[in-house]
Amino acid sequence: MATAVRSGRLSSWQSFCQWVTDTNNRIYIGWFGVLMIPCLLAATTCFIVAFIAAPPVDIDGIREPVAGSLLYGNNIISGAVVPSSNAIGLHFYPIWDAASLDEWLYNGGTYQLVVFHFLIGISAYMGRQWELSYRLGMRPWICVAYSAPLSAAMAVFLVYPFGQGSFSDGMPLGISGTFNFMLVFQAEHNILMHPFHMLGVAGVFGGSLFSAMHGSLVTSSLVRETTENESHNYGYKFGQEEETYNIVAAHGYFGRLIFQYASFNNSRSLHFLLGAWPVVGIWFTSMGVSTMAFNLNGFNFNQSILDSQGRVLNTWADMVNRAGLGMEVMHERNAHNFPLDLATVESTPVALQAPAIG
């Protein structure tokens, strides 16, 4: 080692380490990237192959397989990688645990392969963001912001199946499968009435509003550096020291549009809010899904409001309850699991009132 250093020569391992951690590479690899790249490649390759050609999967564990691939009659909208069978439950199900490849495919082993590699890959991607920020001397807030969508993926692909007792309850990897997951989640957990979901909606929609407001304000107060016949965008030079827009003008406009203290006079605190608002909202949504995974559900307004004559006063909660019961009846209808709230001896009071005829 000492001889190699003195002579200026590096071993193969040292050269590899230097290349992996070199921030001058066109694309930074990093040690987290060494884990991320093969995992995401494996997940992507398996997902594409399964989406195109995977055979039907016995998702409910009742020998009634559900087809999700394109070659079995689906299109881009209806296709999905179907979650692993309810007969597998939470068991780790690699290829070598099945008696044959056909059995592994029938029980939905592809779903576990894709999801586990994907979760490891996106977790390593967050680590890679921190690693590159550290090596460049930047603050670590980029990976903190990325932790919001990462936590959401962990919630629907890992925490929720663990709470429900089977990976068959995980979110299918497809467009209509995602919508089905959302409808069933509402039917079983009343997520619309959960305060954490409400905070998540405020975070996502509020973040979109703030982003649009900020972008439009900046674009409307650019410092003109070009002639009338040229685009404003040509007046910006990459790396220029001076501000590209007039923050005083933007502050004055917005302060007069609403009120003075609704407008930021500090660009740094403004951009912190733009980053923190949606991130905190998505964190709350992830926590909400994680708590509902263990059946700590949204607010339950089963008792309808009655007037002095005993007549139902319809509310939004009644509409949500009726919709939830309908979705619950349609879910897994071949598994013959009748919803418990419809199978009880005492009927659940909902806003159902027969119209007067004649």
Swiss-Prot record:
GO terms for cellular component: photosystem II; plasma membrane-derived thylakoid membrane. It is a multi-pass membrane protein. Pheophytin a binds at Y125. InterPro entries: D1/D2, Photo_II_D1/D2_sf, Photo_RC_L/M, Photo_RC_L/M_CS, PSII_D1. PROSITE patterns: REACTION_CENTER. Keywords: Calcium, Chlorophyll, Chromophore, Electron transport, Herbicide resistance, Iron, Magnesium, Manganese, Membrane, Metal-binding, Oxidoreductase, Photosynthesis, Photosystem II, Thylakoid, Transmembrane, Transmembrane helix, Transport. Coiled coil: none annotated. Gene3D superfamilies: Photosystem II protein D1-like (1.20.85.10). Residues 344-358 form a propeptide. The chain crosses the membrane at residues 28-45, 117-132, 141-155, 196-217, 273-287. Fe cation binds at H214, H271. It catalyses: 2 a plastoquinone + 4 hnu + 2 H2O = 2 a plastoquinol + O2. Tyr-160 forms a radical intermediate that is referred to as redox-active TyrZ, YZ or Y-Z. One of its GO terms (biological process) is response to herbicide. Cyanobacteria usually contain more than 2 copies of the psbA gene. PANTHER family: PHOTOSYSTEM II D2 PROTEIN, PHOTOSYSTEM II PROTEIN D1. Belongs to the reaction center PufL/M/PsbA/D family. This is Photosystem II protein D1 3. It comes from Synechococcus sp. (strain CC9311).
